[in-house]
């Protein structure tokens, strides 16, 4: 039986084939991405640097001496590599279990290609079993929670957690997400919401899944 960590490592290392020399690489956040950062260290001299989606990833990149650049100073970024908490077969994702969803969404949007890396347990038929994170400006927390209840969710404050942007996160359970694009837009239109963890308007372009049989590659249908 292969462990989840083995699957994550396989997928993360497979993403290295998308890394081009002399380019800037977008780097996500989380346990799977940490394996990618470890692999990226071996070719740090051959890339122009990285754009990081969180303070945690920035710290790990700098540990290896990999340059971290400000997105505002970067022109084109061929790829962004990140994990997911769930993916459907259309490569629409739930992300943000680690709390870095807003910066992840920004860096993903700025990249030409989004390569998602995960172990095979993350592939689901319908999104929503994993609680959907919503980043909220603190003063709007109660109002946003009431609006999320109207959408059929059960929001819960992620206690003791503040995002890199100084905001709070509501984790929303009980959503069977049949129309991810529509729900992503609906939630983002609630005043006080910074963004939510649905990556449906900008899904992944490639999904690499670590399985016992090797790395399985899916592209958006």
Curated annotation (Swiss-Prot):
Signal peptide: none annotated. Pfam families: Rib_5-P_isom_A. Keywords: Isomerase. One of its GO terms (biological process) is D-ribose metabolic process. Belongs to the ribose 5-phosphate isomerase family. Homodimer. This is Ribose-5-phosphate isomerase A. It comes from Alkalilimnicola ehrlichii (strain ATCC BAA-1101 / DSM 17681 / MLHE-1).
